[in-house]
């Protein structure tokens, strides 16, 4: 089986965290025996990325015996669905179905438009993969599959705390809280995390908030082993990779009730879901800091190991191809349907928002 993965997010030397989960999945699919080709969409003029991608995709399909196209994110899925030569699977990541949230926790109008386009697209592709039950509830049920992103257990594994701190140049006596996202992305809610850290530091001056942003996956894993707790106060998520990676490193955490966090942490000791209240977050983190133990989170997320998730994705591919072999016809959207949500101006704004959101 040959699969063409199409994406506008993919790690580079300058941005090693950008779309790292897409690369992880591509590598796990290859390891499982899938013949994977990549089409990474980019252009020096961002407004031209998606219109240009339509031609790039057609040329690639004309010159390759691809069985199926797997697109990451709704906008890329719209590009993929402008052709009907091969079936299309789209993985939605969160905001492309749920909409965008600003720094005040309010929904943005453009985000609502993009989410509407994503939901329309889900009815027109051969399969839609989403990250959580919440996302699944927003789209047509006949072809939706809940498959959260996997965790690379080889990279994200526990390292002795002192050893990790030495490698990162951190102080051995400090109590570090980790904020592992871009502080400039409003939905990640950095000011709240800073307020929680300040609240705790008034009673315990050894507490310090660390920000890990745009790090390589290997360094991020070290931060997770070096720190005492993850603070994750996001307004909205699909299935947050940071939470799953922290679980794989046995890092205690306190999170808002977003995406599938509650399901991920389950009954793991020293992992908490809290209301977005500074005193409540601070109280839970103080409990963690009182004994500074590690969790057994890694054992709770074995089902999210790369090989296990790859098999679930492959099962979707196989089901789609069997259906195609049976000559089942998908509903084709009108040209106007797709073009209305592929306008260059909106595509430009959407890509910028996706880039900001996916920086760790």
Q: What are these language model-derived features?
A:
Residues 252-255:
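Short hydrophobic beta-strand element within catalytic cores of glycosyltransferases
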Residues 235:
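Aromatic "clamp/platform" in nucleotide-sugar-dependent glycosyltransferases that forms part
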Residues 58-59, 108-127:
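Membrane-proximal helix-turn-helix segments that form the acceptor-binding/catalytic region
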Residues 267-278, 286-291:
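Conserved acidic donor-binding segment of nucleotide-sugar-dependent glycosyltransferases
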Residues 4, 170-188, 194-197:
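Conserved donor-binding/catalytic core segment of Leloir-type glycosyltransferases
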Residues 122, 222-227:
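Short alpha-helical donor nucleotide-sugar binding micro-motif in glycosyltransferases
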Residues 3, 68, 83-100, 128-129:
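Active-site proximal beta-strand in glycosyltransferases
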Residues 151-167, 324:
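Acidic anion/phosphate-binding donor-loop and adjacent secondary structure
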